[in-house]
Each structure stands twice: as structure tokens, then as C-alpha cells.
């Protein structure tokens, strides 16, 4: 799995952002780490294309 920076906030949904060769995940406070990892794994192809 691609390493990522996690930013927790009051938002209601998960979001992925690619910026400067980094993967940034924005997640609600209440989201478990396992759910975040599943979300990142499910978008691995998109992340790889974006970082290529």
C-alpha cells in the first residue's frame, strides 16, 4: 500500500488528494484506521496513475 498523510477533520466523507508526489487522505474523526486503509487500497490503481 502506498504511504499516505492522514488529515482528520469534521468532514463527512473520505477524500484522496495527490499533491507534490504525496498522497493525502482526509477522513472524518470517527472513521476507523481499518476503513481508511481499505479506502486507500481500493483506490490504489488511481493513486498509481496519478503519481506516474
Q: What does each model-identified segment do?
A:
Residues 1-52:
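Active-site-proximal or metal-binding-adjacent scaffold patches in catalytic folds
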Amino acid at each position: 500500500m502506498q504511504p499516505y498523510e492522514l488529515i482528520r477533520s469534521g468532514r463527512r466523507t473520505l477524500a484522496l488528494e495527490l499533491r507534490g508526489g504525496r498522497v493525502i487522505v482526509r477522513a472524518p474523526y470517527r472513521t476507523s484506521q481499518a476503513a481508511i486503509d481499505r479506502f486507500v487500497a481500493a483506490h490504489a490503481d488511481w493513486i498509481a496513475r496519478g503519481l506516474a
